[in-house]
Amino acid sequence: MLRRRGGPNELRDELNNSKNQPEDDQRTKRGRESIGFRHWIYFVLTVAIVYAGVVALHRKMPAVRDGTSFEDFSEQRARVLLKQLTALGSRPSGSDNLEVKAFGMIQDRIGKIHSVVDEVGVNRLESDVQRPSGCFDLKFLSSFTLCYHKITNVVVRIGPKKGPSGNSLLLNCHFDTMPDTPGATDDAVACTIMMDVLEVLAHSKTELENDVVFLFNGAEENFLQAAHGFINQHPWRHDIRAFINLEGTGSGGREILFQAGPGNSWLLQTYLENAPHPFCSVLAQEIFQSGIIPSDTDFRIFRDYGRISGLDIAYTKNGWFYHTEFDEEWRIEPGAIQRAGENVLAVVRAILKSPYLEKPATFDEENRWVFYDVVGLFTVYYSVNVGKLLNYIACFATYFLVVLRIRNRLYSVGDLAIAFKHHVVAFLAMVITMLLIIAFVVQMDLVMCWYKMPEIVGALYVLPMLIAGAIVHSHYADNNRIRNVEMVQYDTILLSFASILFLMTFYNLSSAFYVLNNLILPVFKDIIIWALGLFGVIRRVTPRVLFFTQLFCFLPTFVFAAYAISQCVDFFVPVMGRLGNAINPEFIMGPLGLVIASGFILFVNNLFYISRRMNYIIRLLFAIFALFILVLITTKVGNPYEYSHENPRLRRIIALHANRTIYDFEGHLTQKDNALFVHSLDYRGASDLPDHSFLQGSSAPNCTGVVDEYCRMPYYTAIHELFPPEQSLWVPVPSPVVLPYPIDLKLVSRHAMGENLNLTFEIRGGYDKMSLHVTPLNDYDLLSWSFTDIDIKEFGRRQTYFVFMTYGHEAPEVRRFWILLKNKNGVAPDPEKHENIELSVATHYAHGIYQDTETLRQLRAMISSRRQTPEQAVGWWRWGITMVGGRSEIVVKIF
């Protein structure tokens, strides 16, 4: 006859007679049927097999299709243009590589496709070159203003031959890059995918139901300027009803749908139903939209300025290569382009046929879908309302189960309280362990030791926290006096998940699906045991039956956990290399390890109470951890950076060879110097750079008495909050920078009007990237200016306002602007006698023949040589560097 825990009353009574007494429970625990070492080996092997299977599926790519058939997308065809674009090298907006060479390649391909459309005779194709100018305000990393002049957009529209349908789908990519990167994944590959999709549609012998607009934009890396120019100024913008934005923040791998909306849930549903290789998660959307990721895409521009709903899709694997010299075509593995192209083509075809494309956009509609893929095999999606219902049902079913057991005297509320105390103490022990590990890492100068090898996070943080949690629960198990202790501990697991699920649902977090998946099957553990007994599979409930049933119930949990962990570690570890100097990344990776470790302990803690003593296993784990620490501090395993041809894991730096001139209120030159302005993009900072004559006598800039938030430094963009001036280096060098276009800043007029002061300025010279620091002085505040209709309340009042000015195809002869200041005291002092405003104008030569000086060329050569031979001297691993560089000038004047 079956002995079991919980369930129908007649079986529960038999279970109680055999198992309810604490002394019987303790004897069972120490007996031959209790869980032993080999069962924990089974458990670890199961988790390892699940993780390996998940990773294998995560890396699986479809076969590359032959390029001779135009019925389907072909990576083989797409790579031809990709190789051509990346062979040009870096392509910043305004460079010859972009404005002439890459532009010519794209135009040439469009011309050939136009001939195909004319030959087939079913559809029509139009193309246009747009060169917009404009300004807008942006809150990203900081608050700043962007102005652009004649940047380049190449726009193509294909649709039914009878004429524009009035309803268009927009596909967007950008073919410009950051300086010093060939930009294969960011974002040339997206443009080649779009080009092949266009070619497939061009060969179609079936008339398209609606139009598709392809935007090849040439100034995304200037903070989304080209998308802004298109959606605000191009005549085709009025017919666009939805968009797909293609991006890249890594190199290859599977592209993920990480943003959808706002509103227009049919658009998301179309992707979920039609993409043959889905990879998506509402959890990724909520993380990205929270702002913790230092990145942004054109999705924001189309959403905020065009009020259009869309899909944001990006490559994220190998983020170490993002915005570096290593973002190369050959690093994108075969099949990665094929799967993205097949997904995009299938979704485009489905959207064009959708009747919803013709309906007015429900833009203000909230997200209505919970969606995620299951290891890339299929997608699960349901409405938010259905999700809330499922979540609350799962919560109340759990609460009902616990109440039922309390009423049937299987355990008491006091027993639950004691079990929760076990969880709290275990969690506190893990938190303390995490903090001790972080302190050890900082003290031993091991910060970011996991950067080149993400697996170290598991050994450094997860393992010791697992040991801490196991010690606590093992101690309580050895001193247990609760009857049915395993049941009590297990039910507190369910209560914990149910409570978390309830709170996430209450606060409208769609990512609550993840907790729901961890709760559904474990709730049915006892029912499964009852069914096994009913069909004669088991005769009685033993610790081993409980173990294997729980292992089965938690298999989906392990799959989802392994999937989430592999994605989070793969994504977040490389991001730490560009997160800046303000946040110690150990306080990000440590809590990430805590989530993994505490989740694992929570899943299995009840098994400690039906196991033999855990002392041997704990000692073994501690010995493994001690051996790991020894290896970490005595070998190169603990070095955060390492160069290899296949997998470079390098420190990012920006090095600008700059001339700086400073003038006082009277117009007298007070300071003129030449230096390397260097900042490291990760937390180890510029002070961690290797010792060399280039850096001898260097120190952080002296910002004493400087009002400018940017410390009168030639920042490329407004990133001083992530990379503060005091964390950078100002390295004096003897050689001045030869400047082909020196900056000439002049005051044109100055008019006082009561408490207001209007100043008009002109800037001549400078290159295609220019930064303006506007710092009001002597109780003045910025009221307005000619760049934008700035809303100070929305924008945020600042000590220094930053304007990033660029040009693309053509340079402006002069930049003329006015600034209106308001005095806080109500009466403006005599502007002729008092300082009113400080302007700093910096320009950057980030491409072409003017980019490098001899000093920068020597620095590049030294980095390239020494990062390949770190074994030649102690500490040479610090030469594991990848560099963005250029010449620069900054002129500071007080008016």
UniProtKB/Swiss-Prot annotation:
Zn(2+) 2 binds at residues 186, 221, 323. Its main location: endoplasmic reticulum. Residues 1-30 are annotated as: Disordered. Residues 10-30 have a biased composition (Basic and acidic residues). Its EC number is 3.4.-.-. GO terms for biological process: proteolysis. One of its GO terms (molecular function) is metalloexopeptidase activity. Residues 1-34, 405-423, 474-492, 539-544, 608-613 are cytoplasmic. Zn(2+) 1 binds at residues 174, 186, 247. The keyword tRNA-binding does not apply. Its cofactor is Zn(2+). Keywords: Endoplasmic reticulum, Glycoprotein, Hydrolase, Membrane, Metal-binding, Metalloprotease, Protease, Transmembrane, Transmembrane helix, Zinc. Binds 2 Zn(2+) ions per subunit. It is a multi-pass membrane protein. The active site is at residue 220. The keyword Protein biosynthesis does not apply. GO terms for cellular component: endoplasmic reticulum membrane. Residues 56-383, 445-452, 514-517, 566-586, 635-895 are lumenal. The record marks 322 as: Transition state stabilizer. Belongs to the peptidase M28 family. PANTHER family: ENDOPLASMIC RETICULUM METALLOPEPTIDASE 1, METALLOPEPTIDASE M28 FAMILY MEMBER. This is Putative endoplasmic reticulum metallopeptidase 1-A.
